[in-house]
């Protein structure tokens, strides 16, 4: 009986910790439109900042740039941060500042809608940093 209660308590604590973690997670699907004449250079900046962020920042779960098949100037970046604090730290990094300052003149339009994960538990199966 004691072991059963301990197991139940551990499951509740585990669930509570996971719920708290998921409440603080930041998920965005950045929508960026780049001027055609700057597309090649923009993609180089984007690939560099995304790679360095995932490699060097523990709180960056995912930065995954994608290009529209219909319009190559439309970029989408799946951004997942472990917390608001991780996102704020990311904004202060040298590699993000290099990207931000280096691409200001290249970006025609930018939207940063925040998304709400429908199944945050599945993220642990997809993203290694969430395990």
Language-model regions: role of each:
Residues 37, 48, 70-72, 82, ...:
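Short alpha-helical
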Residues 26-56:
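N-terminal targeting signals for Sec/Tat export/insertion, comprising classic cleavable signal peptides
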Residues 8-18:
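Hydrophobic h-region of N-terminal signal peptides that target proteins for export
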Residues 11, 46-49, 94, 103-106, ...:
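Alpha-helix boundary/capping residues
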Residues 52-62, 80-115:
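An amphipathic, aromatic/His-enriched active-site/gating alpha helix that lines ligand/cofactor pockets
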Residues 4-5, 20-27, 64-71, 100-131:
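Glycine-rich beta-strand-turn "strand-cap" elements at beta-sheet edges
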Residues 25-33, 62-91, 129:
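Short, well-ordered beta-strand segments in beta-rich or mixed alpha/beta enzyme
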